[in-house]
Structures are given as C-alpha cells and as structure tokens.
Design a protein with these regions (language model features):
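A structural signal for well-ordered alpha-helical segments within the folded catalytic domains
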Residues: 9-12, 16-23, 120-127, 146-153
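Short, charged helix-to-loop "capping" segments that act as catalytic/coupling loops
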Residues: 27-29, 68-77, 136-144, 161-162
C-alpha cells in the first residue's frame, strides 16, 4: 500500500533519522519542543512536520521533514533538513534526494560538504556490522541500539505534539 504503515508515519520512519542526528550533533537530550504538521489530500498521517525546541544544554534545534515541498511543482526544493544552533555555530544538514549537504559553521571555520545522496547506506552498515562480528570488537562507527530507541521515542513524541496542535489537511 501507499505510505509508511509498517514503519509508522513518515516522520517516524524517515524523520527519526533527523531526530537522531540532531541529538548526536547537540550531544545532549531533548528538553522542549513544539511541532506542527500538515496532512495532504486527506491522507491520515502528515506529509510534512516541523519541530523546533531546545536541548538540555541550551542548544536549539529545528527539524523539518516532508515530502511536499512543491510536491507537484516542476522544480522542487529541498525535502528535509535539520538545524542545530548553538552560541558558537550551527550544524545544518539537508538533502533533495539527489545531493546531501552538511554545513558546519563555527566561530573560526566553516565547512560545506556536498555528496551524492546515498539513501540509508545499508551496505556500509552491513559491512561494519560484519567486521564487528568477525573480529569480536564493536566498531565505534556503528550506531547504538539505545540511540535508535531514543530517536524512535522522540519522533513519536514530536508527532503526538503535532497532532495536539491541529494537523490541517490541504490539497485536492
């Protein structure tokens, strides 16, 4: 069927990766948030969700995840991004399903890294996992299950917050 029913709504299935990356960049746990979402064409789950808030260390975040940036327009813009904002800089990640861009803007340095969008890099994860099993040594480049569980939990919390803040349905 259409949508992300097995993995949950789009913001859980796809958006939880942005929730995870934002938490990793901030190096801290989420403290406050406010989410807003839009449903399209009366689909029951949102196609676009924006959530902003703070981490316990005062760092601010903005996560926008959606598949509706001019969905039917000739030239689409980006589809998803995160901003993690601190007093000494910003970490920004965005992609348009063709190119992934990471910008790190600090007090003394700015880095912009652009690479072809590579999906979820499952083959890299499998290789790292296989090496860990073969050697019996955990590869620190692998994500922790705990981090995935936390990202999933917060993605659901942000989605629930958006539901409480009204999710209009647009499109015909």
């Amino acid at each position: 069927g259409e949508g992300h029913e097995y993995e949950g709504p789009s913001f859980h299935d796809c958006g939880m990766h942005y929730v995870d990356i934002s938490r990793w960049y901030a190096g801290c746990e989420y403290k406050t948030w406010h989410a807003q979402a839009i449903r399209m064409w009366d689909y029951p789950e949102p196609w676009w969700l924006q959530c902003h808030g703070t981490f316990e260390n005062g760092v601010v975040f903005d996560i926008t995840q959606g598949h509706v940036y001019g969905q039917l327009s000739k030239d689409q813009t980006h589809n998803s991004y995160i901003d993690v904002i601190g007093t000494k800089g910003i970490a920004r990640m965005s992609h348009d399903f063709k190119t992934a861009v990471v910008e790190l803007r600090g007090v003394n340095e700015t880095h912009r890294i652009e690479k072809p969008y590579g999906g979820k890099n499952i083959s890299t994860l499998c290789d790292l996992f296989a090496d860990s099993v073969r050697t019996g040594v955990f590869n620190s480049r692998l994500p922790l299950m705990r981090d995935s569980a936390i990202a999933s939990e917060y993605a659901w919390k942000f989605l629930d917050n958006a539901r409480r803040n009204e999710m209009p349905s647009i499109g015909n």
